[in-house]
Design a protein with these regions (language model features):
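C-terminal output helix
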Residues: 107-118
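Active-site residues of response regulator receiver
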Residues: 10, 55
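Two-component/phosphorelay signaling modules centered on CheY-like receiver
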Residues: 13-32
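Receiver (REC) domain active-site loop signature in two-component systems and cognate sites
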Residues: 58
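Hydrophobic/aromatic residues positioned on beta-strands within the core alpha/beta folds
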Residues: 82-84
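Active-site beta3 strand of CheY-like receiver
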Residues: 47-53
Length: 122
């Protein structure tokens, strides 16, 4: 079976670790976690994820800037980006910065899995 490659970028290491362990336990995904937004673009270039889950609010660089870096990279511009945030109003979307809709934290495994299926068809 060809496992989908997921990159989770969030400065909350406990959150990314929990998502990684939970998703990998299903046997369908290979998950890489990155807690530094400034390293996310380089990590994505090396890992070549099928989808990126990206926190909006991070120290040093925000998720919007990371998304713009990814979108401008010919190797990564096709990769779906799903924004993760605890700060969401019902009228906000991620489309204004080249991404896909937000998932509100705390994110359930069901919501995350459904999002992967919607974007990658698994």
């Amino acid at each position: 079976m060809n496992k989908k490659r997921l990159l989770i970028v969030d400065d909350e290491s406990g959150f990314t670790r929990l998502l990684k362990l939970t998703l990998e336990k299903t046997g369908h995904y290979t998950v890489l976690e990155e807690n530094d937004g400034t390293a996310a673009w380089l990590v994505a270039r090396e890992f070549r994820p099928d989808i990126i889950f990206l926190d909006i609010v991070m120290p040093k660089i925000d998720g919007g800037d990371v998304a713009r870096q990814i979108r401008s990279d010919p190797l990564l511009s096709h990769v779906p980006i799903v924004f993760l945030t605890a700060i969401v109003s019902k009228n906000e979307t991620g489309s204004d910065i080249g991404g896909f809709p937000f998932l509100a934290k705390p994110v359930s495994l069901e919501a995350l899995t459904q999002c992967v299926v919607e974007h990658l068809g698994q």
